C-alpha cells in the first residue's frame, strides 16, 4: 500500500477547479483479484489468524536487510503504472517531473501544491529571458536518485530545495538532505545546493517569494513568507 498525500488543511479546504478521472479508464489498471486477496488478509474476528513473529538478535538484522531488493525495485514499478495512466488519460507523470527552460541554470526542487505557483512564476521569468526551472517530486519514498539526476538539465549551476517542514536540531530538512545525498557522487556534485522553508501553518507562498528564491545566490539557508 502507498500513502497518497497532499499539503494538508489549506489544500483540502479550498475551492478549486479539478479534473476527475473516469473509473472506467482506471479499473483496467487495477488487479481486482489481488485487491480482494489483500482485503481477505485483513484482521477479522470471524476468521482470526496470527500475525507477526518474535525474532532473536541472531536473525532480526538479516530479516530487515532482506527487504532491500523489494524497495530497490519499487520505483520502476511505480513508473510502469504512471506510464499506463499517462497512456490512458494523457497525463505526463514521472517519478520526477521537470518544468522550465531546457538550459536552466537555477532550478527549484519541491513537492506538493507549491509547484503550481512555481510554474506560473517560471513562465513569467522565462518570458523575461531567465534560465530557470523546477523539478517536481512525485514519488518521495523510495527516493530514486537516478530518476532525480535524469530530470535535472545538464546546464544547472544552482539548486534550491524547498521543504514545507522544520526539523529542529537536524542539519537540514528531509527533502534537502535527500537531494544532497542523491547528487553527491553524480555529475552535479559541484552544483551549489541551497535549502529553504516555506508555507508552515498554511502561510501563503506567493510568486514574488519564488522570484526571491531564484534571485538568491548567497544565502544557503533561508525561509520565505515571513515578513515581521
Model region roles, listed by residue range:
Residues 158-228:
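Peripheral docking tails and interdomain loops at the edges
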Residues 2-98:
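Conformationally flexible catalytic loops at phosphate/diphosphate-handling active centers
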Residues 5-7, 109-112, 135-138, 161-164, ...:
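Generic beta-strand/beta-sheet core signal
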Residues 77-93, 110-118, 138-145:
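A general structural motif
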Residues 103-130, 143-150:
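Redox- and metal-dependent alpha/beta enzyme cores, enriched for Fe-S-associated oxidoreductases
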Residues 19-22, 120-129, 149-153, 176-178, ...:
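Short, solvent-exposed amphipathic alpha-helical segments in soluble enzyme
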Residues 13-20, 119-121, 147, 170-174, ...:
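Short acidic, glycine/serine/threonine-rich loops at helix termini
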Residues 6-13, 33, 112-114, 166, ...:
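Glycine-rich beta-alpha junction loops
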Amino acid at each position: 500500500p502507498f500513502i497518497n498525500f497532499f499539503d494538508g488543511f489549506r489544500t483540502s479546504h479550498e475551492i478549486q477547479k479539478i479534473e476527475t478521472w473516469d473509473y472506467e479508464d482506471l479499473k483496467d489498471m487495477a488487479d481486482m483479484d489481488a485487491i480482494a486477496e489483500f482485503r481477505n488478509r485483513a484482521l477479522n474476528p470471524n476468521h482470526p489468524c496470527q500475525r507477526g513473529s518474535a525474532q532473536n538478535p541472531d536473525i532480526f538484522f538479516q530479516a530487515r536487510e532482506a527487504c532491500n531488493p523489494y524497495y530497490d525495485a519499487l520505483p520502476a514499478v511505480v513508473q510502469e503504472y504512471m506510464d499506463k495512466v499517462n497512456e490512458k488519460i494523457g497525463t505526463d507523470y514521472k517519478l520526477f517531473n521537470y518544468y522550465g527552460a531546457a538550459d536552466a541554470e537555477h532550478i527549484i526542487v519541491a513537492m506538493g501544491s507549491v509547484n503550481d505557483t512555481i510554474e506560473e512564476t517560471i513562465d513569467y521569468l522565462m518570458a523575461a529571458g531567465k534560465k530557470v526551472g523546477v523539478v517536481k517530486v512525485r514519488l518521495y519514498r523510495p527516493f530514486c536518485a537516478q530518476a532525480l539526476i535524469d530530470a535535472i538539465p545538464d546546464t544547472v549551476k544552482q539548486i534550491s530545495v524547498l521543504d514545507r517542514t522544520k526539523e529542529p536540531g537536524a542539519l537540514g530538512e528531509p527533502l534537502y538532505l535527500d537531494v544532497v545525498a542523491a547528487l553527491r557522487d553524480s555529475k552535479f556534485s559541484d552544483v551549489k545546493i541551497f535549502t529553504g522553508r516555506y508555507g508552515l501553518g498554511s502561510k501563503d507562498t506567493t510568486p514574488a517569494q519564488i522570484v526571491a528564491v531564484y534571485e538568491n545566490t548567497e544565502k544557503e539557508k533561508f525561509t520565505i513568507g515571513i515578513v515581521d
